[in-house]
Amino acid sequence: MEFYIKYFNRKYNLSYDILRLSNPYGVNNLSKSLSGIIPTYINNIVSDNEIKVYGNGDIVRDYVYVEDFIDLNLKLLTTQEKNNIMNVGSGKGTSISELIKKIESVVGRKARIEYLPKREFDVDKNVLKITKVRDIYGWEPKISLSEGIKRTFHWMKGLK
């Protein structure tokens, strides 16, 4: 996809910004099925359903709160800087075990966890380097993972 976008830039002089997004989460996810690990884990813990963890919980991912991502998009609309490819995330890694502990703390309930064999296709660590978006646009995420989980939980609680 990025190849085609760059091609149209060269051929038709169309400007672009490509954002490579980590794992977004947050309020107003209106899909009927829960998508994303954070709302799924919140729902499972609240409902006392088991959480499936592949491996021992040491897989590390990068999570970005949706409002931070929206703020960046609004900033991109109002700037002259164009034609960049950037990673968008928190730039911080959180293991699945750490994530579960943070959610348990917010929800006030212990998770029931089913540990399954690690899947071959799971990458051990995926944390985005956000230096470029910080340097070019002065953007950094403002909402911590703990605060984002709290906001997501309270929003989900209001839907029930």
Q: Model regions: which residues?
A:
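PAPS/PAP-binding and catalytic site of the sulfotransferase fold
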Residues: 95-107, 148-152
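Glycine/proline-rich active-site loop of Rossmann-fold NAD(P)-dependent oxidoreductases
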Residues: 26-40, 49-50, 54-58, 66-67, ...
